[in-house]
């Protein structure tokens, strides 16, 4: 099929067979898995997944691609295609133990990752191809330049594994940036205290609103320097120097 990639959907189609096989190896799909693919595109990953699975659900927003995907020989009787924007879908409707995969459009990858956290109790694992810079941010340790809101929110909910890089020449058209594969596995037993996710997201967003300012400055009116000291958190530090566990402490304090 000749399909002109659409800029508004951030489309870059994976074509490199070696990379596709490496992604499949990382996912390790089993026949009875409850698997969902976001943005299947031209089916580079969809078709080999269908060969291994009894059933695959896929969410595709592009109407041209929806028609193409339903006509693939491998899709017959096995592909459950949802014509929708992934940012509007209730992922828990597909049942428990959901395994989510996808080459996420770079223009919506961050909001989509944050959105998926709402359905984390229904998800067993997630394997995504993302812009390399986004994967670096997700996996970043506190105290590093890449560490930010996305790092805290995803590391609070999931074990993060940076798997491997994908060069631009693996795609058509070639993106101007490198890509990478990440595995996100929601904790069954969390290493962190349980807190209100909305409160955590709010405190993290405020803390990182101005990265060059101190935590005390960014959280002015929410928590005082003396209260930070009582929690054992250095208010003179910048937001990227505060660990996930410390942000959890802050969210718990605000909730109380």
From Swiss-Prot:
Catalytic activity annotation: adenosine(1518)/adenosine(1519) in 16S rRNA + 4 S-adenosyl-L-methionine = N(6)-dimethyladenosine(1518)/N(6)-dimethyladenosine(1519) in 16S rRNA + 4 S-adenosyl-L-homocysteine + 4 H(+)
Classification via Gene3D superfamilies: Ribosomal RNA adenine dimethylase-like, domain 2, Vaccinia Virus protein VP39
SUPFAM superfamilies per the UniProt record, alphabetical: S-adenosyl-L-methionine-dependent methyltransferases
Pfam families: RrnaAD
Listed GO CC annotations: cytosol
UniProt EC number: 2.1.1.182
Keyword vocabulary terms for this entry: Cytoplasm, Methyltransferase, RNA-binding, rRNA processing, S-adenosyl-L-methionine, Transferase
Compartments reported by the entry: Cytoplasm
Residues holding S-adenosyl-L-methionine: 12, 14, 39, 60, 85, 103
InterPro entries: KsgA/Erm, rRNA_Ade_diMease-like_C, rRNA_Ade_Mease_Trfase_CS, rRNA_Ade_methylase_Trfase_N, rRNA_adenine_dimethylase, SAM-dependent_MTases_sf
Main location group: cytoplasm
Family the entry assigns: Belongs to the class I-like SAM-binding methyltransferase superfamily. rRNA adenine N(6)-methyltransferase family. RsmA subfamily.
Function according to Swiss-Prot or TrEMBL: Specifically dimethylates two adjacent adenosines (A1518 and A1519) in the loop of a conserved hairpin near the 3'-end of 16S rRNA in the 30S particle. May play a critical role in biogenesis of 30S subunits.
Protein name, entry field: Ribosomal RNA small subunit methyltransferase A
Organism encoding this protein: Legionella pneumophila subsp. pneumophila (strain Philadelphia 1 / ATCC 33152 / DSM 7513)
Gene: rsmA
């Amino acid at each position: 099929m000749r399909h002109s990639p659409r800029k508004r959907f951030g489309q870059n189609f994976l074509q490199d067979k070696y990379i596709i096989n490496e992604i499949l190896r990382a996912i390790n799909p089993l026949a009875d898995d409850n698997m969902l693919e976001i943005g299947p595109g031209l089916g580079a990953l969809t078709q080999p997944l269908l060969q291994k699975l009894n059933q695959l659900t896929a969410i595709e927003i592009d109407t041209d691609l929806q028609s193409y995907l339903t006509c693939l020989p491998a899709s017959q009787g096995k592909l459950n295609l949802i014509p929708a924007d992934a940012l509007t879908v209730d992922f828990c409707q597909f049942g428990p133990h959901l395994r989510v995969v996808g080459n996420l459009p770079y223009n919506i990858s961050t909001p989509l990752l944050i959105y998926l956290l709402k359905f984390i109790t229904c998800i067993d694992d997630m394997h995504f191809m993302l812009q390399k810079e986004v994967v670096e941010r997700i996996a970043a340790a506190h105290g590093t330049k890449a560490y930010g809101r996305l790092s805290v929110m995803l590391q609070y909910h999931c074990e993060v594994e940076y798997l491997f890089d994908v060069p631009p020449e693996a795609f058509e058209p070639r993106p101007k940036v490198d890509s990478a594969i990440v595995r996100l596995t929601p904790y069954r037993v969390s290493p962190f205290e349980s807190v209100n996710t909305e409160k955590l997201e709010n405190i993290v967003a405020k803390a990182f609103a101005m990265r060059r300012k101190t935590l005390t400055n960014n959280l002015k009116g929410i928590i005082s320097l003396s209260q930070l000291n009582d929690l054992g958190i250095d208010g003179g530090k910048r937001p990227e120097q505060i660990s996930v566990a410390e942000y959890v402490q802050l969210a718990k304090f605000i909730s109380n």
